[in-house]
């Protein structure tokens, strides 16, 4: 597994900072946000690799960097960590053909598209880089990962806004179940913290603007003072492998994907339906495919974006768990890293697996005054030690698309 | 070496990320300097920009080596 996020570089570095209750949110540093309503975001810290920060040239050769948008850079960083961690180095042509890639993104190369638009607008269309299109295309993370490692199996991608990461992992696991591949590198990557991205989500009234002076307090899922999400950037990548295949080669196995459910709201382009019934149906489908009871789930990593929709998700989760609601912990790790859009679901699925490994529920930061009371423990402020055998992670996207994934320790 | 040759060499080093010593006049962009077809398109654009010249597509296709580029630009500049 591999992560690059506003908490930094690397799986264990991210996890230890998350459990310690640290925040990766700050004032936007990559450009001057003064003209925009929202001034805060979660950006991947630049700096030395050994300090858990990103030095891009350690991961992507300088001459290749300009051929890819930043979301591809971040995807390659996390994919490199994940592939190395998995120890999977297919030597034979057959093994390479049985290894695929499915990495999604919600937005793709937004800054690249912006820059190219300016070039064309200035009447310099003939000066447009030949790398513009392959730099911006969402499936090019999968493309670059396959080229880097020689993975010749299914090469696919997912675009379902903020549900892309979960859909990619879920769909990739289904490809393995269907026999299309033995190994799939899957996840999501996003880098939309740029003027166009911030302006666009601001215009949709989706971003927090009330905490510009106190960035670390801006992402506050379920808190009564929340006023929108905080955008984050990064990538989360996992290596999925057919169980017997992984066992046979003595692979390090973090966990098993046991359930996956999807649904559509058929309601509104950005708002969830009443009671988040689409989320309920996605979770229900995941529980059904896992063949478990909701009460078997010890931890829920919520979509919980720090918007009004948080309480609707809460209602849907309460409905799913019924009388077992008081037994489950649910937190939103977006409180620490912001909303990584198309990478969110992948990073959060990884956090869910680590929650099982270490029997610890990561905290929901800034949950000072819940807007709604609930029997569900939302792990306010501090991580909690508790027995977690099975975890569920939710992701919902614009367009009314919902995905839930259920993981178990091995 | 001419001023044009110096500048061409610099652009090649920068765009292809290769050692300066490898950028000899005879070096082929694709065979010796690791460029692909998209790299060569970008390289020609960089020459056009840097020397304020137009390099039409049929001429660009014939620019395979560092010397080809230098000769073409020198000819344009002399005209």
Curated annotation (Swiss-Prot), chain B:
<keyword id="KW-0596">Phosphopantetheine</keyword>
<dbReference type="GO" id="GO:0000036">
    <property type="term" value="F:acyl carrier activity"/>
</dbReference>
<dbReference type="InterPro" id="IPR036736">
    <property type="entry name" value="ACP-like_sf"/>
</dbReference>
<feature type="domain" description="Carrier">
    <location>
        <begin position="2"/>
        <end position="77"/>
    </location>
</feature>
<keyword id="KW-0275">Fatty acid biosynthesis</keyword>
<keyword id="KW-0443">Lipid metabolism</keyword>
<comment type="similarity">
    <text>Belongs to the acyl carrier protein (ACP) family.</text>
</comment>
<protein>
    <recommendedName>
        <fullName>Acyl carrier protein</fullName>
    </recommendedName>
</protein>
<dbReference type="InterPro" id="IPR006162">
    <property type="entry name" value="Ppantetheine_attach_site"/>
</dbReference>
<dbReference type="GO" id="GO:0016020">
    <property type="term" value="C:membrane"/>
</dbReference>
<keyword id="KW-0276">Fatty acid metabolism</keyword>
<dbReference type="GO" id="GO:0000035">
    <property type="term" value="F:acyl binding"/>
</dbReference>
<dbReference type="GO" id="GO:0005829">
    <property type="term" value="C:cytosol"/>
</dbReference>
<comment type="pathway">
    <text>Lipid metabolism; fatty acid biosynthesis.</text>
</comment>
<keyword id="KW-0444">Lipid biosynthesis</keyword>
<dbReference type="InterPro" id="IPR003231">
    <property type="entry name" value="ACP"/>
</dbReference>
<dbReference type="GO" id="GO:0009245">
    <property type="term" value="P:lipid A biosynthetic process"/>
</dbReference>
<comment type="function">
    <text>Carrier of the growing fatty acid chain in fatty acid biosynthesis.</text>
</comment>
<dbReference type="Pfam" id="PF00550">
    <property type="entry name" value="PP-binding"/>
</dbReference>
<keyword id="KW-0597">Phosphoprotein</keyword>
<feature type="modified residue" description="O-(pantetheine 4'-phosphoryl)serine">
    <location>
        <position position="37"/>
    </location>
</feature>
<keyword id="KW-0963">Cytoplasm</keyword>
<dbReference type="InterPro" id="IPR009081">
    <property type="entry name" value="PP-bd_ACP"/>
</dbReference>
């Amino acid at each position: 597994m591999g992560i690059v996020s506003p908490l930094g570089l690397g799986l264990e570095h991210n996890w230890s900072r998350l459990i310690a209750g640290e925040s990766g949110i700050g004032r936007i540093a990559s450009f001057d946000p003064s003209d925009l309503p929202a001034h805060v975001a979660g950006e991947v810290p630049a700096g030395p690799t050994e300090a858990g920060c990103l030095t891009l040239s350690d991961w992507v050769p300088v001459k290749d960097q300009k051929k890819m948008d930043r979301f591809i850079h971040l995807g390659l960083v996390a994919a490199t960590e994940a592939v190395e961690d998995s120890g999977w180095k297919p030597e034979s042509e057959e093994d390479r053909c049985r290894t695929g890639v499915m990495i999604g993104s919600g937005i793709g190369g937004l800054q690249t598209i912006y820059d190219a638009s300016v070039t064309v607008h200035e009447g310099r269309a003939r000066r447009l880089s030949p790398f513009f299109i392959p730099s911006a295309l969402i499936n090019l993370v999968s493309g670059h990962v396959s080229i880097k490692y020689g993975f010749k199996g299914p090469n696919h991608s997912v675009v379902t806004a903020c549900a892309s990461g979960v859909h990619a992992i879920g769909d990739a696991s289904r490809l393995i179940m269907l026999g299309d591949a033995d190994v799939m590198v899957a996840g999501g990557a996003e880098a939309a913290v740029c003027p166009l991205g911030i302006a666009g989500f601001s215009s949709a009234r989706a971003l927090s603007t009330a905490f510009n002076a106190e960035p670390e307090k801006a992402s506050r899922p379920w808190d009564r003072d929340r006023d929108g999400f905080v955008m984050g950037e990064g990538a989360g990548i996992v290596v999925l492998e057919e169980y017997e295949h992984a066992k046979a080669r003595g692979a390090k196995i973090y966990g098993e994907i046991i359930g996956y459910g999807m649904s559509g709201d058929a309601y509104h382009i950005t708002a969830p339906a009443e009671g988040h019934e689409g989320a309920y149906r996605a979770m229900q489908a995941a529980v059904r495919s896992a063949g478990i009871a909701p009460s078997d789930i010890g931890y829920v990593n919520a979509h919980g974006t720090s918007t009004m929709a948080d309480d609707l998700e809460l209602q849907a989760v309460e409905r799913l768990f019924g009388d077992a609601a008081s037994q489950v912990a649910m937190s939103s790790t977006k409180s620490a890293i912001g909303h990584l859009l198309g990478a969110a679901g992948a990073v959060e699925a990884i956090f869910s697996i680590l929650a099982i490994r270490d029997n610890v529920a990561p905290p929901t930061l800034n949950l000072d005054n819940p807007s709604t009371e609930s029997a569900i423990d939302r792990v306010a402020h501090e991580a909690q030690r508790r027995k977690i055998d099975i975890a569920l992670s939710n992701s919902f996207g614009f367009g009314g698309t919902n995905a839930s994934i259920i993981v178990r320790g091995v | 070496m001419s001023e044009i040759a110096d500048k061409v060499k610099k652009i090649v080093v920068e765009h292809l990320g290769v050692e300066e010593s490898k950028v000899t006049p005879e070096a082929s962009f694709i065979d010796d300097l690791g460029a692909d077809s998209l790299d060569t398109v970008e390289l020609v654009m960089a020459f056009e920009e840097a020397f304020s010249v137009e390099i039409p597509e049929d001429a660009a296709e014939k620019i395979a080596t560092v010397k080809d580029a230098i000769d073409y630009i020198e000819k344009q500049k002399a005209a």
